[in-house]
């Protein structure tokens, strides 16, 4: 399988994960778990917290100690464990911490996916400016497919 197809699959799955819960989680927390609006908002605010803190820290880790591909895989496995735990949460505190931990490990994967893609394209002597946008658009398609599958 060519590098472009492998990167298409990676980008598709990267955003499929996010699309599988981002839009439907609020309705689930309000309708099924009966969380209040402020609680739902606080859980979604963890995305901003994680976005501010973690990409820089994981960038340092990826630059100094662990290569980006390995760190990317580790973070996704940790995120899967957090999402599995979140699926069992029935109260606000457990859901809040599960989603905070999930987003602390998921948000850095957005930039790591780009790093992995750029490095792979460069290694295979591809034109990043020309070849990456059609690959990245499959992330958006993955997000949309996940929303359709879940809702």
Task: State where each predicted segment sits.
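Helix-loop boundary and gating motifs at the non-cytosolic
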Residues: 1-49
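Hydrophobic alpha-helix/TM-entry signal in multi-pass membrane transporters
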Residues: 3-11, 72, 95, 99, ...
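Hydrophobic core of transmembrane alpha-helices in multi-pass small-molecule transporters
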Residues: 12, 82, 92-111, 116
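Interfacial helix-cap and linker-helix signal at transmembrane-aqueous boundaries
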Residues: 29-30, 61-63, 137
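Helix-breaking motifs and short loop linkers at transmembrane-helix boundaries and internal kinks
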Residues: 34, 66, 88-93
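Residue-level signature of mid-helix packing/kink "hotspots" within the transmembrane helices
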Residues: 48-56, 144, 148
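Helix-to-loop junctions at the C-terminal end of transmembrane segments
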Residues: 53-67
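Structural signature of the two symmetry-related core transmembrane helices
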Residues: 70-84
């Amino acid at each position: 399988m060519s590098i472009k197809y492998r990167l298409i699959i990676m980008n598709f799955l990267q955003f499929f994960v996010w699309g599988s819960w981002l839009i439907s989680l609020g309705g689930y927390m309000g309708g099924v778990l009966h969380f209040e609006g402020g609680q739902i908002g606080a859980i979604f605010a963890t995305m901003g917290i994680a976005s501010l803190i973690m990409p820089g820290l994981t960038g340092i880790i990826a630059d100094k100690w662990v290569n980006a591909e390995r760190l990317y895989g580790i973070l996704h496995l940790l995120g899967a464990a957090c999402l599995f735990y979140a699926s069992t949460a029935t109260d606000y505190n457990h859901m809040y911490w599960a989603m905070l931990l999930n987003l602390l490990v998921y948000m850095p994967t957005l930039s790591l996916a780009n790093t992995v893609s750029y490095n792979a394209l460069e290694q295979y002597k591809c034109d990043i400016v020309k070849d990456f946008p059609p690959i990245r658009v499959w992330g958006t398609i993955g997000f949309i497919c996940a929303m359709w599958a879940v809702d």
